[in-house]
């Protein structure tokens, strides 16, 4: 991932914490009761796990479906590569066919008309508070992240070519909706909705 995606796109980040500059990390907090506590696990080195690492088997130690340490700006560049079906600024990362396959549901989480999972990406059904984006053919695509107090989302509309990237930490749950959904809708309503 680091060589074939991150470096090719000119981004800074990766799954292996020991290969990154800790001075560039944001402090991540969890909310515990009435206070915020700095997360101890967010940037824990996995070096002690490496002697027993088996390619293709031990990969969960790096959180391969997420777990990448990256800035919001660089995550937006990565999202734009997916929005352009595998290409960004003339740099092809994956074939258009593979990119479209990644954005096509292959696993039914619930039933038709509810969120569906593709290959590391998913359709967001009933997520955006705009009836248009709750209609088949208009569902936004993306990925959320949540661990150690971090909450992030990259979500875009293949139909209308808009996208949102957001990262927060130490949130308090909002009654009735997931925090990221509320944040995404606030950004959508302020910046995208006509």
State what each model feature region is:
Residues 118-120, 145, 163, 180:
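Glycine-centered structural positions embedded in regular secondary structure
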Residues 1-141:
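Short, surface-exposed loop or secondary-structure junction motifs
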């Amino acid at each position: 991932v680091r060589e074939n995606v991150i470096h090719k796109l000119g981004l800074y980040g990766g799954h292996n914490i020991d290969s990154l500059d800790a001075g560039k990390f944001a402090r991540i907090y969890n909310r515990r009761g009435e206070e915020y506590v700095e997360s101890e696990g967010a940037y824990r080195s996995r070096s002690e796990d490496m002697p027993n690492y088996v390619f293709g088997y031990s990969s969960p130690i790096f959180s391969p479906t997420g777990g990448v340490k990256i800035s919001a700006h660089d995550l937006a560049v990565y999202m734009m590569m997916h929005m352009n079906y595998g290409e960004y600024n003339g740099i092809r990362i994956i074939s258009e066919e593979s990119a479209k396959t990644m954005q096509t549901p292959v696993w039914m989480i619930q039933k038709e008309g509810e969120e569906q999972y593709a290959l590391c990406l998913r359709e967001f059904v009933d997520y955006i508070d705009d009836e248009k984006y709750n209609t088949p053919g208009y569902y936004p695509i993306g990925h959320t992240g949540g661990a150690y107090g971090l909450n992030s989302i990259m979500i875009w509309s293949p139909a209308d070519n808009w996208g949102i990237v957001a990262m927060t930490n130490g949130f308090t749950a909002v009654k009735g909706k997931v925090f990221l959904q509320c944040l995404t809708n606030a950004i959508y309503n302020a910046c995208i909705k006509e």
